[in-house]
From Swiss-Prot:
This is SR-related and CTD-associated factor 8. One of its GO terms (cellular component) is nuclear matrix. GO terms for molecular function: RNA binding; RNA polymerase II C-terminal domain phosphoserine binding. The gene is Scaf8. Residues 394-443 have a biased composition (Basic residues). Residues 1249-1262 have a biased composition (Low complexity). The modification Phosphothreonine is found at residue 6. Residues 270-283, 447-461 have a biased composition (Basic and acidic residues). One of its GO terms (biological process) is negative regulation of termination of RNA polymerase II transcription, poly(A)-coupled. InterPro entries: CID_dom, ENTH_VHS, Nucleotide-bd_a/b_plait_sf, RBD_domain_sf, RRM_dom, SCAF8_RRM, SR-CTD_assoc_factor. The modification Asymmetric dimethylarginine is found at residues 915, 925, 936, 1071. It comes from Mus musculus.
């Protein structure tokens, strides 16, 4: 019974899904049912109960469950052994009575399943036939009082006798207008005769159905006319004539069977129906004379006419209003039918005409309506196909039939016309003129219909979904991509999708293995969906899934209207808020055909919010010019690169006072009349690509975001003199390079001072700038933005075409949003490529990572953008322009230089390939550029190494500053995040847990450390201290390169890493590391030879972390250790006290041991001997845990914190009493470490072990024994 419980839970979980149910879910339910086949009776009962109790919209999924289970069982066990089908057929009538309580639209799906069952012999014909009759409205064999719904008389059991239909009952059931017509008893008798036939009963039910539908409010034609009803009506009208004609020739049984067969064919919407119609219509007419003319004419035609004229007329009227073809109504078409020249008897002719004309018209109207229905039912067929894997071919056939029907409608109708024409050959005299007239009218309707069809095809090509009346279609252009490999990159997705069209954005969610790809055009995303869903496309190793995704612009309240299959949100007009319209287009587009015209008038009538005017009001002319360009206004472009920006500054505070109409570009803050609604907000054809000058017609400008996008730049900004008087509050919109503050020698003669921009008047409100700045600048700091000195407002901007080469230095001030990735005003050089950043003034509230050169107000903290100066020709790949300032502790890499106060009258630099001519030579030498008293940092070149000769400022005494030697940098220019080989950054030297243990700096260190190696000269006598080191890697001949050195070696000529790159905290461990001079001896350097200009410094060049304590400039040495400081007093190999006190790293097995091992042959051989002999092993438990492999550890000593640094005797750096006084063992405290060291058989594993592994186990901080 466990299997039954599983099946029940699967089945009832259908209620958690919104129909239509997915194929995967159906498969799960079917599998559960097949697993529970031993309890098949329980399974069948569960499904029947589910269908009985579920909500109407879940009835059809319940039928699909039956279908799927029966098909799977027949497929798996064979038709004879299948137990499910017979069991379901036991109770199938009541099951289908419950099924027919589904919504009206779903009935056609039930009929379709029944037809498929019949074709595939899933159930016997005698079982399916009554079910089809039920669909047509024929009750199962018992007639009980009619219910007020389409599912009348469904609760009967088969086998009970039929109660006769009396004329009185019929009269009661008929609507009032008919009762008056059926007054006399002859008529009543005739009616009774007709209505007692099965067709009569069907007709009765149809009448009631139509009545009910008339009473219901009819929101749209599609809901009013459900497919089943129209088909039934068409079938019955034709059938009743034929039945009345053949009443004497056919037995009732034959009649029923033939009728049902034909009816069933109708439901199939196939071409077969035409053949049945053909045969039916060509039945010999003489037979009609056997039937009483009174019945034929007076009663039946009155009923038929009533039906068609009352119901179909109003329905078709509705339909025609929608489609607006000029179509002829039934009355028109019947006007000409009663001519004097009818060759048949008048009654016969009129009856026949009555039938032929309405039927032809009915056929037209049904076809028009079918066109609409096919659009919806196409999806139903697909859905059905999902649930019937067995009958795929059949389903495909039926689908192609429905679609071919919708495609080839006009030829089919011509066929039906020609058929009726062939019948009229007998009556050619009377019908010639009429048929001509009809053809004219018909051709008119065909042409309009063809137009509608072509329009629909066009829409499908564009990927647009079908239009629904009084409904706004918001079409998504966003695709959901599922099962994306977690290793996949954004580039992989871009490569896959860009062949279909322009991509607006890609949002990846690696943990969920999916991504959202937003395309610019609906057509592109539609094609991508079609193609990628059909094949098995892989990204990485996984086959992706793809589907429509709800676009961002549709808010939560509208999500209920989302249709995932069509990728469209159908929002009823009455639910749409006009304010939300603009937002809908984000990640999608609005189908213009579905927009309510009233909304546009509502939007147009809303007053345009005028910009807040400053003291100077704009000229009226300007206003008009903006209005005239309204027609050309396009919506502002969405930033194509999707760069996150800070919240946009309100437009109110950005408006400059006025700008002359002749200006080619509107000023930065100007906010014109908003664009007309419903235009797609993505690609703006009126704007040039990024990097070009804007067109002369001012396109619309959105308020620029507070932060520009990050673009690497390599332009030079001249130092500006900013006097405190010039520093005033200004609006963001006009913060530009103030020409008055550029030194006269820097501005070329072609650009007179004053023509850069038109500053705002002083009447601008003063709250603006603090309002902008307060987000980013810490509150305790003095923020003084820069203002340009007053410039005559008549000045015009220089505009120059993008390709022109210019020697004038400053080209023009660029509008903030010329394109989506240049949002900052600035100066453009002549030959800057599109991706270059804009250089120039920047508002003070820029974030750290913006990477744009900016003017830094004197007292603003380093947290906001600072002015960085970059040499002319060097590209800067890091995206941050600026040098890491010596004492800025954040790792963010701020732009760390500031302009000096006075103007620098330096000679212009004359480099041929210079990007920006006529800018001053920025020769960076200490003391060359006067330092302002305010700035804390020297003005250094960022991005490339500064001169190699200069050690970091303030690291050496002032007396030791040498003259500059060459063009290479002093120190480590690369901020901590950019470590080579991804080694984690070391904390800096201030972080020693116990500040008392910190070693004094400078010369004091020499006195304190008694165990220095006196082979080195004292620090005062050093020479060549700043000579650039030689980048030259040599190794001991004959010693195999240790595999651990592989990843650590620097590139041979990379001057950015002068020594080996750091390997997490592996610098000075327990044992002192190899002395550099000793190492040189090994390499064949004679000791008397001075350190050469290209000698390779083997030492680490990053300072070791010391925890805690504030940092001074001297201690922030990690940044500047790249230089060759051979005699560095602190982290040199001989400073045993320093090394011992700082480090607690027991598990480090890299550099220090290599250096120690290589230091000299005697020491190397001695270590090997110790590791290899019995004596060494005997002492394991006292002193250290040696690995068996000499390469991994030569030896291992106790914690540095437990040794005294100063009184350990030393011979040549060797600790001779190493074995005599064993330090306390750390390893018993840390069993994990003990195992790790002891199991050094895993040497090879550990050599290649990751840095992360070492980190996680290595550091053991024994703070409790620190004082001993």
């Amino acid at each position: 019974m466990e299997a039954v419980k599983t099946f029940n839970s699967e089945l009832y979980s259908l209620n958690d899904y919104k129909p239509p149910i997915s194929k995967a879910k159906m498969t799960q339910i079917t599998k559960a049912a097949i697993k529970a086949i031993k309890f098949y009776k329980h399974v069948v009962q569960s499904v029947e109960k589910f269908i009985q109790k579920c909500k109407p919209e879940y009835k059809v999924p319940g039928l699909y469950v039956i279908d799927s289970i029966v098909r799977q069982s027949r497929h798996q066990f064979g038709q004879e052994k299948d137990v499910f089908a017979p069991r379901f057929s036991n109770n199938i009538i009541s099951t289908f009575q419950n099924l027919y309580r589904c919504p009206g639209d779903d009935k056609s799906k039930i009929v379709r399943v029944l037809n498929l069952w019949q074709k595939n012999n899933v159930f016997k014909s005698e079982i399916i036939q009554p079910l089809l009759d039920m669909a047509a409205g024929i009750p199962p064999p018992v007639v009980t009082p009619v219910l007020a719904s389409t599912t009348a008389a469904m609760s009967n059991t088969p086998g009970t006798p039929v109660t006769p239909v009396t004329p009185a009952n019929v009269v009661q059931g008929l609507p009032d207008p008919w009762v008056s017509q059926i007054a006399n008893t002859d008529t009543l008798a005739a009616v009774a005769q007709i209505l007692q036939s099965p067709q009569g009963q069907q007709l009765q039910q149809l009448i009631q159905t139509l009545q009910i539908q008339q009473q219901k409010p009819q929101p749209s034609i599609l809901q009013a006319l459900d497919a089943g009803l129209v088909v039934q009506l068409q079938a019955l009208t034709a059938q009743l004539t034929a039945a009345a004609a053949a009443a004497n020739t056919l037995t009732p049984l034959d009649q029923g069977v033939s009728f049902n067969k034909k009816l069933m064919d109708r439901f199939d919407f196939g071409e077969d129906s035409e053949h049945s119609e053909e045969s039916k219509k060509e039945m010999p007419t003489p037979q009609l004379s056997h039937v009483s003319e009174s019945v034929n004419n007076s009663i039946f035609h009155q009923i038929a006419e009533q039906l068609q004229q009352q119901n179909l007329e109003q329905l078709r009227q509705q339909l025609l209003e929608q489609q607006q073809p000029q179509k002829v109504t039934p009355q028109d078409s019947q006007e000409g039918t009663f001519g004097s020249e009818h060759s048949a008897s008048p009654s016969q002719g009129s009856s026949q005409q009555h039938f032929l004309e309405p039927e032809a018209n009915l056929d037209d109207s049904i076809d028009i309506q079918q066109q609409d229905m096919d659009i919806d039912e196409g999806q139903d067929v697909v859905e059905e196909e999902i649930f019937e894997p067995e009958a795929k071919k059949v389903a495909v056939r039926s689908r192609s039939r429905t679609h071919s029907r919708s495609r080839s409608r006009s030829p089919r109708k011509r066929r039906s016309r020609s058929r009726s024409g062939s019948r009229k050959r007998k009556h050619r005299k009377r019908s010639r003129s009429h048929s001509r007239e009809k053809k004219r009218k018909a051709s008119r309707s065909y042409s309009s219909e063809r137009r509608a069809r072509e329009r629909e095809k066009e829409r499908q090509k564009k990927g647009l979904p079908p239009v629904r009346s009084k409904t706004l279609s918001v079409c998504s252009t966003t695709l959901w991509v599922g099962q994306v490999d977690k290793k996949a990159t954004q580039q992989d997705l871009t490569n896959l999708f860009e062949e279909f069209g322009q991509i607006e954005s890609i949002n990846m969610i690696p943990p969920r293995g999916c991504a959202y790809v937003c395309m610019v055009h609906r057509q592109d995303s539609f094609r991508a969906l079609q193609k990628l869903s059909s094949g098995s496309y892989k990204i990485g190793s996984k086959v992706i899934k793809i589907a429509w995704a709800l676009n961002k612009g549709v808010k939560t309240e509208y999500k209920q209207f989302w249709d995932v299959d069509l990728g469209v949100t159908y929002i009823p007009w009455e639910k749409v808020k006009v304010d939300d319209l603009d937002g809908f287009a984000e990640g999608g587009m609005i189908d213009q055909e579905t927009v309510n015209a009233e909304w546009e008038t509502v939007k147009a009538s809303e007053p345009v919010k005028e910009p807040v005017q400053t003291a100077q009001s704009p000229a009226p002319v300007e206003k008009e010019s903006v209005v005239t360009t309204q027609a050309e206004v396009f919506p502002p472009p969405v930033a194509m690169l999707q760069i996150p920006v800070a919240p946009a500054v309100p437009a109110v505070s950005l408006v400059p006072p006025a700008f002359p109409v002749s200006m080619p570009v509107p000023p930065p803050g100007f906010n014109p009349i908003p664009p007309p609604p419903f235009l797609r907000a993505s690609f703006n054809p009126s704007q040039p690509p990024p990097g070009f000058m804007p067109p002369p017609v001012p396109p619309p400008v959105v308020p620029p975001p507070a932060i520009p996008p990050v673009v690497p730049t390599s332009l030079v900004q001249p130092p500006l003199s900013m006097t405190p008087e010039a520093v005033k509050d200004v609006g963001f919109g006009s913060l530009v390079l103030p020409s008055g503050s550029v030194a006269g020698s820097l501005a070329p003669s072609t650009l007179p001072a004053g023509n850069v921009f038109n500053p705002p008047s002083k009447a601008e409100p003063e709250e603006k700038v603090p309002h902008l700045i307060e987000h980013q600048i810490p509150s305790g700091e003095n923020t003084r933005p820069v203002i340009p000195s007053d410039i005559p407002s008549s000045a015009a901007m220089l505009a120059q075409p993008p390709g022109a080469s210019s020697t004038s230095g400053i080209l023009c001030v660029q509008r903030p949003n010329v394109s989506s990735n240049s949002e900052i005003l600035g100066v453009r050089p002549a030959n800057v490529s599109n991706s270059a950043a804009i250089m120039g003034a920047q508002p003070p509230n820029i974030l750290n990572n913006s990477g744009i050169l900016a003017i830094q107000p004197p007292n603003v903290s380093s947290g906001s953008g600072l002015l960085g100066v970059l040499p002319p020709n060097l590209p800067n790949n890091s995206g941050l322009v600026g040098l890491q300032p010596p004492n800025v502790t954040s790792p963010a890499g701020l732009l760390g230089t500031q302009p000096p106060i006075g103007p620098q009258n330096l000679p212009p630099l004359a480099i041929p390939a210079q990007r920006m001519p006529a800018l001053p030579m920025l020769d960076i030498r200490p003391g060359l550029i006067a330092q302002a008293p305010g700035p804390r940092f020297p003005l250094l070149q960022p991005g490339i190494p500064p001169q190699r000769g200069i050690p970091p400022p303030s690291v050496l005494d002032a007396a030791l500053h040498p003259p500059p030697r060459g063009p290479f940098p002093p120190g480590d220019l690369f901020s901590q995040p950019e470590r080579p080989f991804l080694a984690p950054g070391r904390p800096s030297i201030d972080n020693v847990p116990n500040p008392d243990k910190r070693i004094p700096l400078g010369n004091d260190n020499i006195q304190q450390e008694g165990d220095r190696d006196y082979r080195f000269p004292p620090i005062e006598t050093r020479e060549g201290i700043t000579r650039p080191p030689q980048v030259d890697v040599r190794d001991v001949v004959g010693r195999r390169l240790d595999p651990r050195e592989g990843p650590g070696r620097p590139p041979l000529d990379a001057r950015d890493h002068f020594g080996r790159p750091p390997v997490d905290m592996r610098e000075n461990l327990v044992r002192p590391s190899l002395d550099h001079l000793g190492r040189r001896d090994h390499f064949g350097f004679p000791p008397e030879k001075p350190w050469g200009p290209r000698d390779f410094d083997e030492r680490e060049h990053r300072v070791l972390p010391v925890f805690g304590g504030p940092k001074g400039l001297h201690e922030e040495r990690g940044r500047f250790r790249a230089g060759n400081y051979r005699f560095d007093p602190r982290s040199g190999p001989w400073n045993r006290g320093f090394g011992q006190e700082v480090h607690r790293d027991f598990d480090d097995r890299r550099r220090p041991w290599e250096r120690q091992r290589d230091r000299d042959d005697r020491d190397f051989d001695f270590c090997r001997e110790i590791n290899g002999n019995r004596l060494g092993r005997d002492r394991i438990q006292n002193t250290w845990v040696p690995p068996p492999h000499a390469r991994v550890f030569d030896y291992f000593e106790g914690a540095t914190s437990q040794r005294k640094g100063d009184n350990v005797p030393q011979v040549n750096g060797e600790n001779t009493e190493r074995h005599a006084q064993p330090p306390p063992l750390p390893v018993q405290k840390d069993p994990e470490l003990y195992e790790k060291l002891a199991s050094s058989g895993d040497v090879d594993k550990e050599e290649s072990g990751t840095v992360a592994g070492v980190e996680s186990e290595a550091v053991v901080e024994s703070t409790e024994t620190e004082g001993t």
